[in-house]
Amino acid sequence: MSDKNNDLKALRHSAEHVMHQAVKELFPAVQLAMGPATDEGFYNDFDSSPEGTDPVLVTEADFVKIEKRMQELIKLDLPITRHELSEAEAYKLFADNPYKLEWVDEISKKGEKITVYWTGKPGEKNSMADLCRGPHVESTGKIKAFKLLSLAGAYWHGDEKNKMLTRIYGTAFFSQKELDDYLHLMEEAKKRDHKKLGQALDLFTFSDLV
């Protein structure tokens, strides 16, 4: 993978951290599960109906306020820093989140280092930590252009025997032009797919008998 692709993955991973922080701040009852960078952008899975709480309805209509909070966090140019924790420290930090504790157990069993990335200064206002291997950009201010794209359901660990979580997809780029170009390409691809589907279903041809 080229340096630029690595840099883009780090940027998108950081955008995902900003997104899940915004989601958690706006919907405090949700439990964050996991969220990687991908070839196309990033996503985050979260539990919107944790045991013992009333379900929280998060829809694409909420993207406007989530993106607004993300912009605020980006404008603050918060540092994103890596920290190594002991198993006990990780258990204390994520005591109220069974998904994170499951990850801590898995990491510990493998004998790997437990690392978290803090957005903002640990423990201060506008800060949040998440289990993560990284890498990330140095601060939220490096995120120049992003967009939340869609919402879907996803089973925990991709196993239908597990609980269905809520997944938000998004993407990020180094510039607004790159983001705009990407969104344009996606829109054109969607139109082509719609046209193909229409032709397959014969939606765009009409019988003289009708």
Report residues per predicted region:
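Auxiliary tRNA-acceptor-end handling modules of aminoacyl-tRNA synthetases
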Residues: M1-A10, Q31-M34, Y43-V210
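Structural signature of FAD isoalloxazine-binding scaffolds in flavoprotein oxidoreductases
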Residues: P36-T38
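Active/ligand-binding-proximal structured segments within catalytic/core domains
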Residues: L8-F27
